[in-house]
C-alpha cells in the first residue's frame, strides 16, 4: 500500500524557536554555575519585545537580559529593518522561585520517604505525565525520513544565510517534506516546501533558483527525487516581514518539530527551558535512548517507547512498547529487556545521561533527536551489546 507522510521544520529565526533558544540559553547559564538549579523558564517574543517568565531556584546569578540579547544576535536579528533588533528590543522579566510544594516531592521521592535508601530514589519526578520515544531504521540517524530531511533543509537555510552564500536571506524560515511510502518503506520524496524570509528587493525568480541550487540540491539525495517531485519555494510570492515582527513567538509551541515530525505519539510536554528533573524533558530523552538502542540491536525495525510518571514518585508508573508489527521478538520480551538494561527513574536518567550539564541550547533548534552536527548523550548507542545478550 502506498501512502504520503509529511513533516515540517523551522529555522532558528522562527519566533517560536527563538523563544526555545532563549529559554534553553538561560537554563544553560544556570546549570553552568549551579548544576542543581531548578528551572522552568518560558519566553514570549513580539514586535520589539521579549518577555522571560517562570520559576527558577538557584544559588547563582544570571544576567537574563544579556543572555537574551546574545541569543537574538547569534540568530541574526541585528538590524532594525528586520523588524527586530537584539540591541534595541526591550526585555521584561518576571521570575519566581520554584513552588515549595513541587520541590518537596522532587527533593525526596515517595520511595525515599517510605524508607528506601537508594540514592537514585531520592529524586522524584517533577510532574506527572506521559512521554514517548521513537526510533526507526529507515535512516542512518534512526529517524523518520520526512523530519530528517526537513531539519537538514532548515539547517542549510541558516548556513547559506550566515556564510554569505545567499546574503539576502533573513533569519525566519520553514521547510516541509512529503515522503511517499510503499509497504511502510520510503520510496521517494513527493514534495518539498521551503519558505524563507528575504530582503524586499530580491525577485521571486532569483529566490527560487538559489534555493533550488544551494539548499535543496545540496541536501536532498538525487535518489529520492524524480520528475514527479513537486517544489514549492516561497509559494506566497513574498516573505519580507517575519520573525517576531510577523508572528508572536512562545516557548514550547513546536513540540512536533522538536521530536519526530508526527511519526509516533507525543505526550504533550515541551522541552525547552526545563531542567532535567522535569520528566517532560528527561524521560522523553530517555525514551528516545531506549528506542534507538533497541532498533540498533535489531529487536525491531521501528519502536515507540511510552513512559508515565507520577509527581514526586521515582519509578515510572507504566512502560509501553509498540513495534508496529516490525518486531523480531515478542513485545513482552522487549519490555523485560528494557527493565533489565535501563533504569528509568529520574535520578538514574540524570546520572546515566549526565543531564546536569549546560547542553540544552544546541537542542533548541533543528530537533532534539537524530542530530549528527552535535553530540547528545541520549543519541549514543551504548546499550546495543547488552541488549543483544537478552535476545
Curated annotation (Swiss-Prot):
Keyword DNA repair attributed: no
Cofactor(s) required, per the database record: Mg(2+); K(+)
Location of the region described as Flexible loop in the Swiss-Prot/TrEMBL record: 98-108
A Gene Ontology BP annotation from the UniProt entry: S-adenosylmethionine biosynthetic process
Keywords assigned by UniProt, alphabetized: ATP-binding, Cytoplasm, Magnesium, Metal-binding, Nucleotide-binding, One-carbon metabolism, Potassium, Transferase
Residues bound to K(+): 42
Pfam families attached to this UniProt entry: S-AdoMet_synt_C, S-AdoMet_synt_M, S-AdoMet_synt_N
NCBIfam families: metK
SUBUNIT field: Homotetramer; dimer of dimers.
Its biological purpose: Catalyzes the formation of S-adenosylmethionine (AdoMet) from methionine and ATP. The overall synthetic reaction is composed of two sequential steps, AdoMet formation and the subsequent tripolyphosphate hydrolysis which occurs prior to release of AdoMet from the enzyme.
Name of the protein this chain belongs to: S-adenosylmethionine synthase
Taxonomic lineage from the root: Bacteria, Bacillati, Bacillota, Clostridia, Eubacteriales
